Every structure is written in structure tokens, then in C-alpha cells.
């Protein structure tokens, strides 16, 4: 071993005094303490020394290694603290700078209305059921007693993905799925998005929202349906609201009716909104058709039921006197902020 250990220590002290940052410190550590470093190589050469000098040289090398490690550790702490302080200064927040106003979001008006409608029916013992928006023709049409030649199946009215797959045109398929998977009594509402091939205008949109209801049990009558919808109308539109049923036709209910409420703007006296009639249509309803019950393996001689369906957008338009359905979808904050 030809290197003088005492001189090597002086050399180390001189070099480490010139180390200015963590990168240079890493290079210094590798040079002296790395696998191929100076100290490591000197330790390997100890075996070449005479036995009477080997112990002393080994002790001196260990002391040198410990000294270098202590110097490295002290410098590392120093440099890390310096970098930390630099980072703190760089990221420092000036609390005297005026803050930026954070815009607080709110629930969309359609979500508010859907929730309000749902909560009324939930309070009457209904449960919420959901289903896929991409639906099979069977659940959307066939099981609901809508034959192949029915106008509703026209490609001009329905978004078909393939011959038997489509975007649901109503949330009624949820009712079929529930009736096929559950035995009566069944008492559900099914809110959700639906799709129809309509031109966009003030009252139509190809995507809109519905809430449909279904109650199936023994002894359910039209009187139960009328009472249920009267409760809903009075709670949602006000206690003075009156309800009337007009005969109509739906393939999935028999008898069927369109349901009107007394005009909430003129009290039934006649105005521009109700076109002078004093009544405004809000939904369709009826007794579940025997064939629909049979399609779901429910005995129509033992069970009866009623169903109803309403458009959330239509209800919102009426309640808030909004004239154009497109306002719901344009994300204009000037409009949406009115319903916080």
C-alpha cells in the first residue's frame, strides 16, 4: 500500500470543502466510498501488508471512512435544508394578495325537479328502479304490447343501434325488467334519460328525462291511480290544484288516460299558457294491460296494476314558467343561476 492515509485525509478535507451541492456530494461519495472508490480499494490492499502493519492500517482506514461518512452526512443535511428553504420560498403564498372568488356549483334545475318528484312518490312507499339506456327491442316494445307494425317502432322515431338493440324511448322497460324479476306487490318509479328522434325546437329534444311509476298488487283500481296522482299534483303544484282524466289510448295500458291539472297560472279561468282552456296536460297513465302482465308471468286474473309516466322537462317548464326546453341544455349560467 503506497498511499499515505494521513495525506489522503487532508486530500479529502480539501475536496469536500469545495463541494457546493447534492450532486457534487454524490460524486465525492462515489469517488471515496463507492464500490470502486479509493477507500474500498485500499481496504482490499490490506492483505498485501506485513502482519505487523496490517492492523494499524486497517484501523486508520476505518477511521478515515467514518470521518468521510460523517462529513458527507453533515453536508447532505445542510444541502437538503437549503433546497427545502428554496422550495418554500418559491412556493410561498402571499396572503396579502386579494383572493380569487371560487365559483360555487349547484344542482341542475332538471335534477332538482326530478328529485322533488321522486321524493313525493318515495313518501308514498314507492322505490326507485333503474335500467339500461341501451335497450333490447323486446323490453322497449314487444313486452309492452307494442306490435311490430306500431308507429312507435318507426326508425324515424327511434334510434336503432341494430335490428333488436336501440336507445330506449321511455323508461317503461325498467317496469318490465322489475316485473320479470320480482313478484307482486310491486311499487316503483323509474327516472332516467330517454331518446327519441325528434327535431330540436322549443318543446322537443332528442334526449330528455322521464319518470314512470308502476303499482301492481291484488285489487289495484283506477281509483287508486286517480288518488295517487291527485296527491302528487297537490304536493308538487299546490293544494288548490285539481286533476282530471281524459280517455286516451296507450298500447300498454287499458283503460288509458291523459291527465290534466287545473292551470297553475290562471287557476283554471283560461290564459295564454293553457290556451284558454283552464287545463294543462302533465302526464299519461292507465291500468296495466293484461297482456303486459302476462308477458311478465304475472296472472292478470289475480293481479292488477296501474302505470303512469311524465316528462321531467315538461313539469319543470310548467312549474318555472320556462318557454324553451333548449335552455335546460345550453349551460348558460345566467339561466342556471336563477335556480340555485
Swiss-Prot record:
It is an enzyme of class 6 (ligase). It comes from the Bacteria. One of its GO terms (molecular function) is phenylalanine-tRNA ligase activity. The keyword Cytoplasm applies. It is found in: Cytoplasm. GO terms for cellular component: cytoplasm. InterPro entries: aa-tRNA-synth_II, aa-tRNA-synth_II/BPL/LPL, Phe-tRNA-synth_IIc_asu, Phe-tRNA_ligase_II_N, Phe_tRNA_ligase_alpha1_bac, Phenylalanyl-tRNA_Synthase, tRNA-bd_arm. It holds the Pfam family tRNA-synt_2d. Signal peptide: none annotated. It catalyses: tRNA(Phe) + L-phenylalanine + ATP = L-phenylalanyl-tRNA(Phe) + AMP + diphosphate + H(+). Its EC number is 6.1.1.20. One of its GO terms (biological process) is phenylalanyl-tRNA aminoacylation. Keywords: Aminoacyl-tRNA synthetase, ATP-binding, Cytoplasm, Ligase, Magnesium, Metal-binding, Nucleotide-binding, Protein biosynthesis. CDD domains: PheRS_alpha_core (cd00496). Mg(2+) binds at residue 254. Binds 2 magnesium ions per tetramer. Gene3D superfamilies: Bira Bifunctional Protein, Domain 2. Its cofactor is Mg(2+). NCBIfam families: pheS. Tetramer of two alpha and two beta subunits. Belongs to the class-II aminoacyl-tRNA synthetase family. Phe-tRNA synthetase alpha subunit type 1 subfamily. This is Phenylalanine--tRNA ligase alpha subunit. It comes from Caldicellulosiruptor saccharolyticus (strain ATCC 43494 / DSM 8903 / Tp8T 6331). The lineage of its organism: Bacteria, Bacillati, Bacillota, Bacillota incertae sedis, Caldicellulosiruptorales. The gene is pheS.
